[in-house]
Amino acid sequence: MNNPLVNQAAMVLPVFLLSACLGGGGSFDLDSVDTEAPRPAPKYQDVFSEKPQAQKDQGGYGFAMRLKRRNWYPQAKEDEVKLDESDWEATGLPDEPKELPKRQKSVIEKVETDSDNNIYSSPYLKPSNHQNGNTGNGINQPKNQAKDYENFKYVYSGWFYKHAKREFNLKVEPKSAKNGDDGYIFYHGKEPSRQLPASGKITYKGVWHFATDTKKGQKFREIIQPSKSQGDRYSGFSGDDGEEYSNKNKSTLTDGQEGYGFTSNLEVDFHNKKLTGKLIRNNANTDNNQATTTQYYSLEAQVTGNRFNGKATATDKPQQNSETKEHPFVSDSSSLSGGFFGPQGEELGFRFLSDDQKVAVVGSAKTKDKPANGNTAAASGGTDAAASNGAAGTSSENGKLTTVLDAVELKLGDKEVQKLDNFSNAAQLVVDGIMIPLLPEASESGNNQANQGTNGGTAFTRKFDHTPESDKKDAQAGTQTNGAQTASNTAGDTNGKTKTYEVEVCCSNLNYLKYGMLTRKNSKSAMQAGESSSQADAKTEQVEQSMFLQGERTDEKEIPSEQNIVYRGSWYGYIANDKSTSWSGNASNATSGNRAEFTVNFADKKITGTLTADNRQEATFTIDGNIKDNGFEGTAKTAESGFDLDQSNTTRTPKAYITDAKVQGGFYGPKAEELGGWFAYPGDKQTKNATNASGNSSATVVFGAKRQQPVR
């Protein structure tokens, strides 16, 4: 029904509104609308972080120095053979530290002798299985041990040698004349420490051994009876038959003596990261008020992670220029280095070469032996170890331990996270007893440091292959300086196969953390494959893929206390279900690549973050965790809708559902500039959202990130 009043009102209202606008009573002017402009997302950049200092010592399981034999034939004019840093040989990972190092032992086994073919060794080492091995290690062999510090498990040091055949060649050039023992001094260990006492001062005692240079007319009468030209024609060493001046054959100790032979007494201040100590000889002749001990060196070193580096100061130097000492310990050393072994740093090994290249020293020391009743022995300062099942002598205040490094390997689809060895050097990957440098030799900072992205001119990630060299016939010729290992079949246990490691490592902006992909490739030789096999069969590869992460943890005292700190980085991931569908992604600094972002509240001990897959908008995983000391633990989960494993499948997209993956990680660098972590989810069907198309879900992930600061 048509209502004229309504029609009239409908016509008047627009006119009224229009007149109101024209009259200034209202406005549609956009300039006067009070709206807040959208704020741009904050822009971040990596914080500056101090680069690791170049390490002269790259670490390792152990090192050995071979005895020298001088060509004393006059016309050869070889009046002196000094020791050199390049003479150090890496021992490799020992099967059992009490045994002789395999590489060096294989060299001495081939040494010819004039009479007996025995290998003589330190009496506490496992006898050699060589013919008549260890025969004669009785009264004439030094007894070398520190009282109450004798039961070593992780580190051994010592000497072994043969009475080498006399060489006298005057018929064929080059003419030569050599005589004397041929062998090694060494230390080696297993299970480099991942945790150490957080504080407190701990005493370590043990033994040390030396080998000298050779020089015409040189005698060391104070330590060795030179009846066979020790120090002149061949190296004098602590296991020599002529070492008659220590108390090696005494049945009881004299007051003031710390043990038998050459012993060490060290103290580690774990709070201040300092090692100090002394190397002494326990003297044989203490009659006529002679000193019961003679100190030859004092040690001082800085502890970094599970390694230490410093100096050895000779304490019995000549007092005047005209004075001479009839022992080789007259020069300081700037090359003291070593490391801690055992789950809690129970034992340590060390080495150094004197600056005058006259003497090399190796040693091993441990915390106090546990009493026979099994109770933990008292630590330095008289306080008992508080940690249950703690190692003897490694108790600190309240028995607290601190993690100094992470090194893990996660095999794709495996439930277990395996621990890797590491020598507090994130840029050295240690697998199968072999050390793999993760940075190119041309790196601006050396093998143990990272280039700084574009500043260093390196890619964000690096891919390379590493094939260990075959065992050399002569271990001395085949071993490089500073622990670069060269053995493959022996040390790496490849059982005659050629093993190649394919490595992808991230990231160029991380100095104290490295993570990535590792592929082991084993290919048999034609002989290994069998005479009837073809060359193609011989080259068949066995491929095993995994991820790794390793980092140098921040000192707990240096963990920040700020809130809302942003870290950004990347990640490697492998996500799968049991329906043969999987997704994998590698680390990248591309805007659309695998991204990791975390917010850390150090004050509240909380960490939250996301891992986002390449070319995805929604987070693949969200992570929530709690910070403890210099690390964190938490959980990772996918969104309730799951993670699409194959986006190209538009009909029935297979998904992965993960709700409770256990995450572990840590903070790395001097000031926690870097963080990283890992998780391996085993593949349980754990959520009601999982469908038959999805099956059981599994995931393997490693991630890393750098602390950010706003761009100014």
UniProtKB/Swiss-Prot annotation:
GO terms for cellular component: cell outer membrane; cell surface. A lipid is attached at residue 21 (S-diacylglycerol cysteine). Residues 556-712 are annotated as: C-terminal beta barrel domain. A lipid is attached at residue 21 (N-palmitoyl cysteine). Residues 59-196 are annotated as: N-terminal handle domain. Gene3D superfamilies: 2.40.128.240, 2.40.128.250, 2.40.160.90. Changing residue 218 to E: Decreased binding to human transferrin (TF). Its main location: membrane. Residues 95-104, 462-475 have a biased composition (Basic and acidic residues). Residues 128-144, 477-495, 689-700 have a biased composition (Polar residues). Residues 197-367 are annotated as: N-terminal beta barrel domain. Residues 389-555 are annotated as: C-terminal handle domain. Residues 372-398, 446-459 have a biased composition (Low complexity). It is found in: Cell outer membrane; Cell surface. It comes from the Bacteria. Neisseria acquires iron by extracting it from serum transferrin (TF) in its human host. Acts as a TF receptor and is required for TF utilization. Involved in the initial capture of TF. Helps select only those TF molecules that can be used as an iron source and concentrates them on the cell surface, maintaining the iron-loaded status of the TF C-terminal lobe until its delivery to TbpA. Has 2 lobes, each of which has an 8-strand beta barrel flanked on their N-terminus by a 4-strand handle domain. Electron microscopy suggests that in the TbpA-TbpB-TF complex, TF is captured directly above the loop domain of TbpA in a chamber of about 1000 Angstroms(3) formed by the 3 proteins, where interactions between the proteins serve to abstract iron 2 from TF. Belongs to the TbpB family. Isotype II subfamily. Binds only human holo-transferrin (TF), via the TF C-terminus. Forms a large complex with TF and TbpA. Interacts via its C-terminal domain with Slam1. This is Transferrin-binding protein B. It comes from Neisseria meningitidis serogroup B (strain ATCC BAA-335 / MC58). The gene is tbpB.
